[in-house]
Amino acid sequence: DEVDRWSGFTTERDRLARTIDSLGLASNLVIVSGDAHMVAVDDGTHNTYGPGEGIGVPVVHAAALDRTGSVKGGPYALGTYPNRFSLRGANDGQYVQMAVSDAGGDEVCVTSTGRRWEYDTQQMVDLLSWSRCFPARLLEARPEPR
């Protein structure tokens, strides 16, 4: 029986992994998640994809706008920033802004900036910033793996 959470969808995860492999995309991939109620980034140092030693795949956690924070997984190369709870009755709010730069050249660059709106001080604070450029290439249409 499949359970309605990520760990329950083994068939779908396997299909997604086979599709990524068949297209050769693992080295050009950034995983974005919002489920952990924290801002955190790993540059691929601690998150590998594929058989054996695998390929380091960056992970960006981008949450939580208004929920009490938590830390899940890790370690993360750029640290973890769980959303803080304020004793004044409101949580801080935080998010990650992702900017993709594609000028039609040889590379596409992604910049992720984690920010927090501090309720107590009423100020925006930058938590972290991470950038990575990937080689730009056109993908050929291939049949879906079975």
Task: List the predicted regions and their residue ranges.
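Long, structured stretches of catalytic cores involved in phosphate-ester chemistry, encompassing
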Residues: 1-146
